[in-house]
């Protein structure tokens, strides 16, 4: 509810927002996308850990451009989190199939598939965070959501 109130206050000052969320922050984003689909211009999901259930109303996901960024995050140092990360990864194919089914405008960046390995769950704090930020910026430019780098 506080997140929605914040968005409502923002609407008085700006024409739209690009939301960037990390991990469990994805949990709150669906409600914002559903409630304010014309105000949310795009969503960047970084290592999203809680994606909506496939049987929920996902109509906003068909309207709002989305970028999903995932690293490999498979360190043996984090066994509990490692098991959670594996659970998230197992759900990704079904989520992507659902996005395809509703004709969502989304881009999936799997960093290991792009040859970028060794990231933690905290991509924004890793040594190559400038490279990842560059990928995100390039996507925003490609979508016409920002003018320059």
Residue ranges and their predicted role:
Residues 20-29:
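Gly/Ala-rich beta-loop-alpha elbow adjacent to hydrolase catalytic centers
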Residues 42-111:
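The feature captures the conserved acid-bearing segment of alpha/beta-hydrolase catalytic domains
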């Amino acid at each position: 509810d506080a997140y929605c109130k914040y968005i409502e206050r923002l609407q008085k000052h700006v024409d739209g927002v690009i939301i960037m969320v990390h991990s469990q922050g994805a949990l709150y984003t669906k409600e914002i996308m559903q409630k304010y689909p014309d105000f949310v211009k795009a969503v960047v999901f970084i290592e999203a850990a809680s994606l909506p259930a496939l049987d929920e109303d996902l109509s906003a996901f068909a309207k709002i451009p989305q970028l999903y960024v995932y690293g490999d995050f498979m360190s043996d140092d984090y066994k509990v989190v490692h098991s959670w990360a594996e659970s998230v990864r197992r759900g990704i194919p079904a989520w992507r199939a659902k996005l395809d089914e509703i004709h969502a405008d989304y881009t999936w960046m799997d960093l290991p598939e792009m040859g970028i390995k060794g990231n933690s769950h905290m991509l924004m704090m890793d040594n190559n965070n400038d490279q990842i930020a560059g990928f995100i910026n390039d996507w925003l430019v490609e979508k016409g959501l920002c003018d320059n780098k």
